[in-house]
């Protein structure tokens, strides 16, 4: 049992955390037919491309800043109830623009949900702005420029997500230069759908402190040595990897092998209801499927806090809470 352990999550896409029950309620509010992507309380998709389409359909039921405040508060409250003390939410200003809300109002809604959740539960949260790779380099660069320009106190990181097979990392490197120059923490999705070469490209061209997923690095011993040497943290999401058939089962998943090799790893839920999981389940899997003991799981939580995109005073406060638990 891991319910008693304090938890931290640094890889979760906000719209991907939308509970099906909330999506149904939102769809009724706006008269949206959900039958194409939500049936019997579960999201419907069969491969990565369909997952992206389903994700986008779910996101369409959130149309106002108030909607985003409700979504954010709902998810963070769920995390807090599972003993989570820190969360980073990945959001896309592109989505705010596409639905006609605008990036500023979209961000304001998320920030309000964070405020309410912290007031209710004490959970600490930061925001990672992401560019969507499948929209092309110009849109990813625009997302980085927005994150750099907005100077929002809760926006502390920049990411690139989306279809990993779209374009070369080099095509998007300028976006990360912009974010780095603005003082934002850097993370990038790599080594999930694509192999270890995508992780190597990320290290060479982006030089992030963290990599989203990165599990395919296990296929290259030299790359593993490099990750150990650089101390780059892998944001590992086992339930997501199984659901998307990156690995056939947990016995095949390399989380334990990565940890045993000395790679810094932590665990997150990615898009939890899409992958029939939750952060609480990911922590339980760490024990039940991978054989980590409480001390080893706490070490992964400590890693998440050590590499979190927060100011040092907040980091020390969070680490002290973990140390006192």
Curated annotation (Swiss-Prot):
Substrate binds at residue 271. The keyword Metal-binding applies. CDD domains: ADA. Coiled coil: none annotated. Zn(2+) binds at residues 11, 13, 189, 270. It comes from the Bacteria. Keywords: Hydrolase, Metal-binding, Nucleotide metabolism, Zinc. Its cofactor is Zn(2+). InterPro entries: A_deaminase_dom, ADE, Ado/ade_deaminase, Metal_Hydrolase. The keyword Ribonucleoprotein does not apply. SUPFAM superfamilies: Metallo-dependent hydrolases. It catalyses: adenine + H2O + H(+) = hypoxanthine + NH4(+). GO terms for biological process: adenine catabolic process; hypoxanthine salvage; nucleotide metabolic process. Gene3D superfamilies: Metal-dependent hydrolases. Belongs to the metallo-dependent hydrolases superfamily. Adenosine and AMP deaminases family. Adenine deaminase type 2 subfamily. This is Adenine deaminase. GO terms for molecular function: adenine deaminase activity; zinc ion binding. Catalyzes the hydrolytic deamination of adenine to hypoxanthine. Plays an important role in the purine salvage pathway and in nitrogen catabolism. Binds 1 zinc ion per subunit. The active site is at 192 (proton donor). It is an enzyme of class 3 (hydrolase). Its EC number is 3.5.4.2. The record marks 213 as: Important for catalytic activity.
């Amino acid at each position: 049992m891991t319910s008693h352990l304090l938890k931290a999550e640094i890889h979760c896409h906000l719209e991907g955390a939308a509970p099906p029950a909330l999506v149904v309620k939102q769809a009724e509010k706006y008269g949206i037919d959900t039958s194409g992507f939500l049936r019997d309380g579960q999201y419907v998709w069969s491969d990565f491309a369909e997952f992206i389409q389903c994700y986008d359909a779910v996101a369409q039921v959130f149309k106002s800043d108030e909607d985003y405040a409700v979504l954010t508060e709902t998810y963070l409250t769920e995390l807090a109830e599972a003993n989570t003390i820190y969360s980073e939410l990945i959001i896309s200003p592109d989505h705010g623009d596409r639905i006609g809300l605008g990036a500023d109002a979209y961000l304001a809604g998320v920030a309000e949900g964070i405020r309410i959740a912290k007031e209710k539960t004490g959970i600490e949260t930061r925001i990672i702005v992401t560019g969507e790779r499948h929209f092309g380099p110009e849109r990813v660069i625009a997302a980085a420029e927005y994150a750099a320009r907005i100077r929002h106190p809760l926006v502390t990181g920049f990411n690139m997500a989306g279809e990993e097979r779209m374009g070369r990392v080099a095509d998007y490197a300028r976006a990360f230069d912009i974010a780095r120059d603005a003082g934002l923490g850097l993370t990038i999705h790599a080594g999930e759908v694509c192999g270890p070469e995508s992780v190597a490209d990320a290290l060479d061209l982006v030089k992030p402190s963290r990599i989203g997923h990165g599990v395919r690095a296990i296929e290259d011993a030299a790359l593993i040595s490099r990750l150990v040497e650089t101390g780059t943290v892998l944001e590992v999401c086992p339930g997501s990897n199984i659901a998307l058939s990156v690995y056939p089962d947990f016995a095949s998943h390399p989380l334990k092998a990565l940890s045993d090799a000395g790679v810094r790893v932590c665990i997150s839920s990615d898009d939890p209801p899409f992958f029939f999981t939750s952060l609480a389940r990911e922590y339980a899997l760490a024990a039940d499927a991978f054989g980590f003991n409480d001390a080893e799981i706490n070490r992964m939580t400590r890693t998440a806090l050590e590499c979190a995109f927060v100011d040092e005073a907040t980091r020390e406060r969070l680490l002290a809470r973990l140390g006192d638990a």
